[in-house]
Swiss-Prot record:
Pfam families: Ribosomal_S13. Gene3D superfamilies: 1.10.8.50, 30s ribosomal protein s13, domain 2. One of its GO terms (biological process) is translation. Part of the 30S ribosomal subunit. Forms a loose heterodimer with protein S19. Forms two bridges to the 50S subunit in the 70S ribosome. Transmembrane segments: none annotated. NCBIfam families: uS13_bact. This is Small ribosomal subunit protein uS13. One of its GO terms (cellular component) is small ribosomal subunit. Located at the top of the head of the 30S subunit, it contacts several helices of the 16S rRNA. In the 70S ribosome it contacts the 23S rRNA (bridge B1a) and protein L5 of the 50S subunit (bridge B1b), connecting the 2 subunits; these bridges are implicated in subunit movement. Contacts the tRNAs in the A and P-sites. The lineage of its organism: Bacteria, Pseudomonadati, Pseudomonadota, Alphaproteobacteria, Rhodobacterales. Residues 99-122 are annotated as: Disordered. InterPro entries: Rbsml_uS13_C, Ribosomal_uS13, Ribosomal_uS13-like_H2TH, Ribosomal_uS13_bac-type, Ribosomal_uS13_CS. It comes from the Bacteria. The keyword Oxidoreductase does not apply.
Length: 122
């Protein structure tokens, strides 16, 4: 297995598909990487030479934010919003939907399981 950006990518798959196993690389970026390095998109990972794998690894290290760095950057952006006290930060803090979705009904994924209300008894 080829190891790129700390991830073992599958050897039997085509190169662009295998690169999407890395957090932060989707289909479009994977195809851009193949074009930039000069690797045919139809080739499989087990057909790549060590030099080609090294070229992919160097290109990703230089041009793409992936894995731990991307996760850290995302969490720091959310923390910054919470520290600012802006509306989006408050929604993150309270565990509610951030992007304007309704919360009267639905939003159970973000709010967690329904809580029982000690309400009126019949």
């Amino acid at each position: 297995m080829a190891r790129i950006a700390g991830v073992n990518i599958p050897t039997a798959k085509r190169v662009p598909i295998a690169l999407t196993y890395i957090h932060g690389i989707g289909n479009h970026v994977a195809e851009q990487i193949c074009d930039a390095v000069g690797i045919d998109r139809a080739r499989r990972v087990n057909q790549l030479s060590d030099a080609e794998v090294l070229a992919i690894r160097e290109y990703i290290d230089a041009n793409v934010t992936v894995e731990g760095d991307l996760r850290r950057e995302t969490s720091m952006n959310i923390k910054r919003l919470m520290d600012l006290g802006c509306y989006r930060g408050l929604r993150h803090r309270r565990g509610l939907p951030v992007r304007g979705q309704r919360t009267h009904t639905n939003a159970r994924t973000r709010k967690g399981p329904a809580k029982a209300i000690a309400g009126k008894k019949k």
